[in-house]
Amino acid sequence: MQEQYRPEDIETQVQLHWQEKQTFKVTEDASKEKYYCLSMLPYPSGRLHMGHVRNYTIGDVISRYQRMLGKNVLQPIGWDAFGLPAEGAAVKNNTAPAPWTYDNIEYMKNQLKLLGFGYDWDREIATCKPDYYRWEQWFFTKLYEKGMVYKKTSAVNWCPHDLTVLANEQVIDGCCWRCDTKVERKEIPQWFIKITDYAEQLLNDLDTLESWPEQVKTMQRNWIGRSEGVDIIFDVVDSEEKLSVYTTRPDTFMGVTYVAVAAGHPLSLQAAATNPALADFVAECRNTKVAEAEMATMEKKGMATGLYAIHPLTGEKLPIWAANFVLMDYGTGAVMAVPGHDARDWEFATKYNLPIKPVILAADGSEPDLSQEAMTEKGTLFNSGEFDGLNHEDGFNAIADKLVALGVGQRKVNYRLRDWGVSRQRYWGAPIPMVTLEDGTVVPTPEDQLPVILPEDVVMDGISSPIKADPEWAKTTVNGIPGLRETDTFDTFMESSWYYARYTCPQYDDGMLDPAAANYWLPVDQYVGGIEHAIMHLMYFRFFHKLLRDAGLVDSDEPAKRLLCQGMVLADAFYYTGNNGERIWVSPVDAIVERDDKGRIVKAVDAEGHELVYAGMSKMSKSKNNGIDPQVMVEKYGADTVRLFMMFASPAEMTLEWQESGVEGANRFLKRVWRLAFDHTAKGAVKPLDIASLTEEQKSLRRDLHKTIAKVTDDVGRRQTFNTAIAAVMELMNKLGRAPQETEQDRALMQEALLAVVRMLYPFTPHVCFSLWQALGGEGDIDTAPWPIADEQAMVEDSKLVVVQVNGKVRGRITVPADATEQQVRERAGQEHLVAKYLDGVTVRKVIYVPGKLLNLVVG
């Protein structure tokens, strides 16, 4: 082996070996335990960023480790290739989205290969290819036939910049998640899939996901939002109309003082027809943001409709108000308002001088003070007629039962989850396979006409979708009847909801999935991706799997057994203020910094002399110009160094702070491993280790080696605390670096240790370990070498160090045989002169002994 560690010499050579040998290509093998490790597929934006590198390194470490355990490991990769950014880039670069996307895929594929990830490239998919989305279209038509798909005109979140519909989850603080434009409300026809039919399953099956982060499961539970309550029917004064509301607090029903309805509710529209001011208010409400999350913070506005509802139990007339905080597509579009015991209702009632009636006593049994805020806690009912004195649960049931008995109420389980709107008014997506015939009938595209292919050779004007702008594209016939194709395309979450299953059989042409392959590999054993996907992708991913199961395509209930959500990658961010007061962000690579003695940045300038403001560590992003190009780092330090730093600098699920000094440290460590191996191999052949004749010092070192193997095995496999696994190997390396190399036994022990170290580091730094394994004379390629197994006998300690206390104060430390009895330990302590002087002339009244650790003698 060469004397110096030169990653540029090693890594290309090893990657070529993997490619030629097809090392990571796998097929189904019933004789082996399978392991399917998957990282969330990337969007081909053009270049990898450090977030990608972290995600895929974690997945690769797990995959390589599981392969060393003898499992048949599938680790595929592909491209989530449809989506809006391609349209923007196409307009900007005067091209079409397809060539831009395919060029990016090619570039990023080479970047992934440079990092040494062990993918089965034969399974690569790009979701924009017809051989992928044809099956998505086929499945959609099957869902339509089953009654799981419908079209309706719906109030949607509309981004006026991107000219597309956004899911509620895609609206952040009233703005588009992608371009930050203020979101508007618009009503357009949309295709929906009935995810609400699966709400109960999606909720209950979270309990089976024992190896998913609690945070993700909690977010999904909250998003599904199961509640138990009562649907209540109110009569409307001088009208045949009925008003239905849903409440989870029937115990407060006697405190209702008004009813609020959505601007789009039939009663609002009826009243607005003869009230111009109300009509203006309704129009204003219907053109504002609709994301539920915004409702809590926005100003509550309302207007009286002039209509009244009748309280079903008291007969009171309750004013009906149109209000901007009621959503037409949640529940019934109407809410009963109990301002005494609901913060939002109190805020609205206070603003518009509506009555506030308390019906729940304070915790101390007194009437609550509602002058400053509502009392939202549950408690004993009062002011509630026959229900006075009942506690929350009894009050809930008594009032619910009475409403049911009177025929004006029905107990109901409700969900916050809404059906999945999958229509997008964009070009670069999979066409929705539906056709509107001449007579207005809507039918699915026949199977023999699938896929409905998206034309790729198009001109983008940045305004309208090429397939909407081309009337010829939409023309088709079904059973000889002319019709027009749907020109909306699928939400790109459709593609990413089932890609994991297609990886099991990407070339299969006889159906959406090959049942044998899908059921061999699925469910995914380990899924890796960001927490930001908790309630969109991960919900749709779970939902789609249940749809596939119910179509007989897979036989498991959930798509992934274990989920790891990696933290974000942060980097220093710097800026200076431009002439117009704007912040001009400067890359940390271009910042010249001064630090204090604690390493904190105290001053920074750029090459042009601008004094920079240090904005702290923040997520690597284009907007703050603080991304670090992985390729630059790989060229400078090698892929193994970048991978090692990524896995060592922070626990996988925590944020990682990018520090080049840390990268340099990882590089120095690999050089030390290389140097130790070089020095060892330079001394020539090694004889086998004779375990029976090891010295105490050699036994101690071998004990440390096997304890390290046991710890690293647990850290990588069960605990997934990869940083502590690396730290343990580093600690062992320090001991190996100090170990004498005088005798044959010393060298034989070093050989055992280095072969183990190289295998423990292999999942993290595979290129250098591949070379070191060969240099050390390891059997075969390290790619097929087994994971080291800790020798239980080697870890057994012959002796123990026991701390001796007298009256709780440490007076000495003694070494005793590992199997020494309490009596033997006491006798040995009495012989220790540092201890003996405290026992002279006193009586031992009590002995506290923690075997092998502590002896405390209480004397008096």
Curated annotation (Swiss-Prot):
A motif ('KMSKS' region) lies at residues 619-623. Pfam families: Anticodon_1 (PF08264), tRNA-synt_1 (PF00133), tRNA-synt_1_2 (PF13603), tRNA-synt_1g (PF09334). Coiled coil: none annotated. It catalyses: tRNA(Leu) + L-leucine + ATP = L-leucyl-tRNA(Leu) + AMP + diphosphate. Keywords: Aminoacyl-tRNA synthetase, ATP-binding, Cytoplasm, Ligase, Nucleotide-binding, Protein biosynthesis. CDD domains: Anticodon_Ia_Leu_BEm, LeuRS_core. GO terms for cellular component: cytosol. It is found in: Cytoplasm. ATP binds at K622. A motif ('HIGH' region) lies at residues 42-52. Its main location: cytoplasm. One of its GO terms (molecular function) is aminoacyl-tRNA deacylase activity. It comes from the Bacteria. Its EC number is 6.1.1.4. GO terms for biological process: leucyl-tRNA aminoacylation. Belongs to the class-I aminoacyl-tRNA synthetase family. This is Leucine--tRNA ligase.
